[in-house]
Amino acid sequence: MDLFLTLLIIAIVLAVAGLLFYMQKKHVSFSIRVLLALGAGVVYGLLLQFFFAPDSSVIQQSMDWVNILGTGYVRFLQMIVMPLIFISILSAFTRMTLTKNLGKISALILGTLIATTAIAAAIGITASSVFQLEAIDIPAGEAELSHGDALEESYAGMEAATLPQQIVELIPANPFLDLTGERPTSAIGVVIFSAFLGVAYLGVRRKQPEAADTFKGIVNALYAIIMRVVTLILRLTPYGVLAIMTRTVATSDLQAISTLGTFVLASYAALIVMFVIHLIILAATGLSPITYVKKAFPVLAFAFTSRTSAGALPMNIQTQKKLGVPEGIANFAGSFGLSIGQNGCAGIYPAMLAVMIAPTVGQNPLEPTFILLLIVVIAISSFGVAGVGGGATFAAILVLSALDFPIALAGLLISIEPLIDMGRTALNVSGSMVSGIFTSKVTGSLDKEVFSDPNEQLDTQDMQG
């Protein structure tokens, strides 16, 4: 009987995937297909929750197979992320429109990312205070305590490292190692290495233009090939979203979520407030927040379901271009946003945990000097946070260890981590796109016609198949 039910569950997922494929062939909007996949995954996951326990053999076996589609899609994206960061930064330097204002553009992007992260930290502090969250209120089961102990063991060296030592760790000693994504700070390592190559290209272009032209041709060719691979992978987005959402909802522990409901509610309240601030920033520059939401929906939906900012990078860059951002700035903003100034994972989350832990070590979390110190530490620690699953935990440990706070609390939230991480990741991606749009607007390079054109969306022929 279990085998029949397992096959039935898998067959229904494949049937919905078949419907999505049929809609693709009929050139149904990419956004609509992603939204349908998201909704279908949630509804189907809830139905499975109603009929089966999350830890039942039927769910475990069927979701293992469904996971091939979901995790397989995310792995394809992760496969291309490091090459895409590398070639995107290099190609940004080879584009004249960017190199003319390189210093100003870099400063604006980084400044926007860090400033919004500081604002996000303040919102996280406020959310923890308003909802009166405290570490002692978090229930600690066997799994949570075990995970907390594992975190303390895994990051023992990081706890001992000072903030300056943690900053030094951002500098790549072996760029080829970072291209494999082995270090937690590999993304920023690749960004730094690529930037050095880009600056070197600018110098060679002045003294040896022929050599620079050869290099530019190679970079442009590689960029075209990498982006073609990206396009092929992005066509799989609706199917990946369907599988990921089905598995996430079907295997979630609803009882644990209800037990920690106040923390979940506070987290999403903070995330929503910060997203509204993103829209206010755009409105303040004379741009329509509604247009932004409509065009950004596919990439935000993917980031929400997949929980990987790095995996969303290809769609992030494409979406910025559809919002009128020059390709060079889009590459910079998207790549920098992977490892610097993540509003959700590196801003709101560490701030909330720090405020919750502070009373247990005798620190008043509402003391102005502590709040200011916390915001500064979070802003600095936001450099180098990985754009893949686990980035928020890494960011929280960086902040807590810098404040000399215990880090085990991060393990106590394991049961609701996937649910909260979805919203955090979507906010991360939104923050990087807003930094690109804001920078383009300030430098006068934003194409307002493209931004306002409803036909300029991710629903391109490339996405249709």
Swiss-Prot record:
Gene3D superfamilies in the cross-refs: Sodium:dicarboxylate symporter
Subcellular location: Membrane
GO cellular component: plasma membrane
Keyword Nucleotide-binding part of the UniProt annotation: no
Topology relative to the membrane: Multi-pass membrane protein
GO MF, any single term: symporter activity
Bilayer-crossing regions: 3-23, 34-54, 73-93, 105-125, 184-204, 224-246, 263-283, 338-358, 370-390, 394-414
Keyword line: Amino-acid transport, Membrane, Transmembrane, Transmembrane helix, Transport
Predominant subcellular localization, coarse grouping: membrane
InterPro entries assigned: Na-dicarboxylate_symporter, Na:dicarbo_symporter_sf
Family: Belongs to the dicarboxylate/amino acid:cation symporter (DAACS) (TC 2.A.23) family.
Role description: Mediates uptake of L-cystine, the oxidized form of L-cysteine.
Protein name, as recorded: L-cystine uptake protein TcyP
